[in-house]
Amino acid sequence: MQKLEKLKSELEGIDIRFNEPLSQYTYTKVGGAADFLVFPRNRYELVRIVNFANQEDIPWMVLGNASNIIVRDGGIRGFVIMFDKLNNVAVDGYMIEAEAGANLIQTTHIALQNSLTGFEFACGIPGSVGGAVFMNAGAYGGEIAHVLVSCKVLTPQGQVKTLDVRDMKFGYRHSLVQETGDIVISAKFALSPGVHRTIRQEMERLTHLRELKQPLEYPSCGSVFKRPLGHFAGQLISEAGLKGHRIGGVEVSEKHAGFMINVDKGTAQDYENLIAHVIERVRENSGITLEREVRIIGESL
């Protein structure tokens, strides 16, 4: 109780929600409660939160905007930090600088408004800029590593530093910050001058492809598995006869087997059980072991 009063006092003015159900915020619509869900408005509030948590030995983590993630049904202890309010985007010539909470799709549309090309590949990728850098998000032959110049990160100790793209150790759905625990707080991208109409047409084409192939009408965590070398996860899952397979309220999408959708009040445990079942069946059928792309965090019930 004393620690709670100290928290309220030292973090006064910051948007803090106590015992907040995370299912309201996740793309899957599953997840238990966070002890303290916080929404910093700027970098200084973020540093205050992290420094307080470290001083008081309270665990903390950043949830981004909870797109390619499954939060377990028991929720998350300590601070869960969401970047919804850290969402400014600025254009300077051919450069775009975006805070980590900026919506990635909206950021690609800002590039379009300024006739800047290079970001079209991301026009349908859900999630935040920070999450996209963390995962080296990509689609249709493009990825964040191709356009990033640098990013500012917050270290686990509460220090802000700048990382150059050459420091980021980018790989397929991988970056340095996955290893270090550094939190991306903003990113700078270098684009190229282009023709507005051409950029718009390419974005419309890619968006149409996504709408045709992906089950965007249901809650989901996006692409569940990484692409195995020389194969497609969705194809392997289909060949194992798993399209439409359901556990609890979660099923393998009929539209795209690489997606798992929440069709009827599914739980995080349903997701975990279905993921494990799919991995096992695909291994039995093809000899290939699928690797998760989606992150699973929090505590089980």
Swiss-Prot record:
Pfam families: FAD_binding_4 (PF01565), MurB_C (PF02873). It catalyses: UDP-N-acetyl-alpha-D-muramate + NADP(+) = UDP-N-acetyl-3-O-(1-carboxyvinyl)-alpha-D-glucosamine + NADPH + H(+). GO terms for molecular function: FAD binding; UDP-N-acetylmuramate dehydrogenase activity. It is an enzyme of class 1 (oxidoreductase). The active site is at R173, S223 (proton donor), E293. The keyword Cytoplasm applies. Its cofactor is FAD. It comes from the Bacteria. This is UDP-N-acetylenolpyruvoylglucosamine reductase. It comes from Streptococcus sanguinis (strain SK36). The gene is murB.
